[in-house]
Amino acid sequence: MSSSRPAVVPKRRVLQTTRLVNALLFALAVAAVPAAAQQRGDGADEATQTLDQINVTGTHLRRVDAETASPVVVIDRQRIEDSGQNTLGQLLQRLPMMAGFQTGPALNSNFSHGRALVSLRNLGPERTLVLVNGHRMAGPASSVASAPGVDVNAIPAAMVERVEVLTDGASSVYGSDAIGGVVNVILKDTYDGFAATADYAQSTHGDANRRTLGLEWGKTWDRGGLIVGLSQNSMNPVFNRDRSYAAKAVEYLDGQVSEVRGANTRAFLTDGRVLTPVDGVAPGPVGEEAFRPYNRATDSYNVYDAQYLITPIKRTNASLHGSFDFTPIVQGYMDVFWTRSKTVSRLDAYGLEMPDAVDNYYNPFGDQLDAYYLRSPQANTRVYTSTMFQTNVVAGVRGRVDGTSWQWDAAAGYARYKDTLVRTGFSITSALNNAVGASFLDSDGVVKCGAPGAVIVGCTPINVFNPSDPATIAALRGTQRPVDLIDESQMRFVDISANGDLFKLPAGRVQAAVGLVYRTNKFAQGTTSDVAAADADGNCDYNDGCILKQGREESVREAYAELLVPLLKDVPFANVLNLNLGSRYSNYDAWGNTTNSKVAIEWRPIANLLVRATGSQVFRAPALGDLYGSPYNSVIDNTGDFQDPCTGFTGAPNPACANVPNDGSFTNTAQFNVVTSGANNVGFKLKPERGRSYNVGLVYDPDQVRGLSLNVDSWRVVLDDMLTGVGYQQVVSDCFDGSEAAFCPLIQRDATGQLTRVSVPFAYNSGKVDIRGYDAGIHYTLADTAWGTFATGLDATFFSSYRFAGDPHNYVGENSSWGNMPRWRAVANLAWDNGPWHASWNARYLGRTVNGSQYENFCVDTNADGSCAYFPIGSVVYHDASLSRKIASLHSTLAVGIDNLGDRKPPRFYSYSNAANTEASTYDTLGRYVWSRLRVEF
């Protein structure tokens, strides 16, 4: 299906026998009769106007006007090609209305898996709905393997016709998740011929080599058409050490810039000495002389040395679009795309605490050994290999009611996302603990695990006190096992919709759209490895996390209706005045139902000035991962940062302090378990997020300057019951102070008041967020001059407010725990066409921000006096350019381009960084990048 075909329009629909559904069907049947009569009586001119109607993202109605009450930014095919990108992620993330945590290939340490997520209004990828030809894509249902949100890099960019970005809440139109807005990717639906495309790119540092090969074939017949695409692309990695700003992890501590280094192998003795192995020790058992005093300056290691700055990736895309006209008014269609991607993330070797090493046979220190930490880069470098599959299939039939304006569409679809993350460099916990723990020399002269009379069968002791011994390295590897972690989501849906004219008013025809949707969402998690399979509390025998084998499913039934009522036309001060109403009912068997509606006004006081206003209700349903995600367990002792609010308790009975004496004598001294899991797993009830979205703006196309268009919009999103993460400290504290009574059943204490367990849901409804700002754009096209055609544009977003209920602070202009939010973001572009030549220039502006938030005490860096240090980050401008020429004699197009012309380095964020000492989801980490592309058509 492609929404670029005017005859039929794909929409969101539903299948449920309810009063609302019956009412919609009755309205559709009744409305079609007068509409048909009116169409027959109005003549051929009216029919021709109907054919000119198109669908616009943000409404189910077909419109003649491209500009409606919904603010939509369009990225056309030429702009995609000018970017030089072979995926959509970076292009979309650079739009000024995108902000906040947007995962991309530059986030190695956050395990992006090569995915690219988009976040409108800094509301998070989970609150930006991504559609392909008007239909939802599937993404991970939980954050166990990767961050939630749809991977826009999985969409085959070579087959994209355009991208429409709706910057307004649209739950009344599309349902859940459309809070910040909607990204609707429209795929090509027609092409005649065969084309081959080759792309190569490389940074001027000589790395990040990118290669793309693509094939495209299409054929159009009298009654249909077919277009098929296949592409493969890959990109080499870039290490942190390959960029000066990222070569070492740095912090600003006590007024000085210092390197953050990791500790190597160390032995802590009871007399206070800290020792480390000397180099060049012969294989075999060692004595105390094989160790020397540990010097942090020389014996520590660079934590960034082995880490990727840009993760390597290989991706294969295949796509198909086909259509067939069964009759002049009925058409069948199918859209399929499939993506496979493979990425690798690397982290340095981690240190292993050996609590029982004092009883190891090879211990040269005897009882003097207090603690031993082993770090083996040869054995414990961590590698994460992710293989992802994304499949989307939609098939349907659409048509029109002959002699009327009514069109209908019936479609069924399937979407699947699967991510298999294989972890290497980690040990089976019991195997490692047994091998490095207690051991002895048996009477047969063989060193064995355990103790005399209690030998651990199948275990060979490891001499961890000679970590460079090849036998030690091999033995450590022998305790390891590659373990997979599988996260899969599936979605099946049936959509039925219709739209057309109801009746005629003096100002024009009243249009309606109705639809029904039935959808099932399913997610599954698990592993093929028995050692990583978790029990109900998240425990397993693997030292890099466990996962519960499980599957869950929910069904969704929805119905919607939308009306466009023309109120005035061709009267003084009202060339056009339209009222747009819409409502959508959604029923989730997992938690209940909700109805979300919108009211929009389109007013043209004169023909070339549009004043628009929209008020919409929005919502987001809790994801299945939020409800049922796999648990994980941790043990907390009284030496950490946890502060029990019941310490010294003397007040009235408090549910957080069950069994705690109130005489002021209590102190929690016991270790306790923290089980973090899906909310339903721990008996915690989640509510959907609900809110409102507002937009007021104008679009002006002055007659005095042909080709000029100006727009400005004021927007606001108010979100109640926002789902956010929570920690065990907050669970206990919020129960104690009464701010969240629902947390109290999650706290368990023994008969003496000592904590035994705290259950923590993945998410909870934290409260209200209120976000406000402005969008503005200026676009001008100067066509058919002696020097060619010029087109220029500027789009900008101004964040004015990002606040939470009960919190007076404005987080805009800060890099805080809510993300990096420059107040200004803008993109300017200039394009030139003259015959076979085309050139483009693009500038990206990121406004000033502050490193850290003084208000929320988000303090990591410190001044000499110990006070928090906050650094102003200046504005950054990136310039990109491209040039292409069509060579008619060779049926080809050659294009070259440069991104980040000035080789601008990202600003330094010290300890506030999410990767490589900077904010990688905001700034360019690669540097100057040169690309070329050749397309040949046959």
Model-predicted segments: where are they?
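C-terminal beta-signal and terminal closure region of outer-membrane beta-barrel proteins
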Residues: P6, L117, I428-S430, S616, ...
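C-terminal beta-signal and adjacent terminal beta-strands/loops
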Residues: S2, D720, S800-S801, A843-C859, ...
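Periplasmic plug
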Residues: S112, L117-T167, A195-A198, A513, ...
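N-terminal Sec signal peptide and the immediately downstream disordered periplasmic leader
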Residues: M1-L95, G214, G218, P328, ...
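Surface-exposed, low-complexity loop segments enriched in small/polar and acidic residues
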Residues: S142-A145, N236-L253, L275-I313, S319, ...
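N-terminal plug
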Residues: R40-E46, N55-F111, V132, M137-S143, ...
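Short loop/turn motifs that connect adjacent beta-strands in outer-membrane beta-barrel proteins
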Residues: T190-G193, G206, D222-R223, T327-V330, ...
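Gram-negative outer-membrane beta-barrel transporters
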Residues: L579, S709-Q854
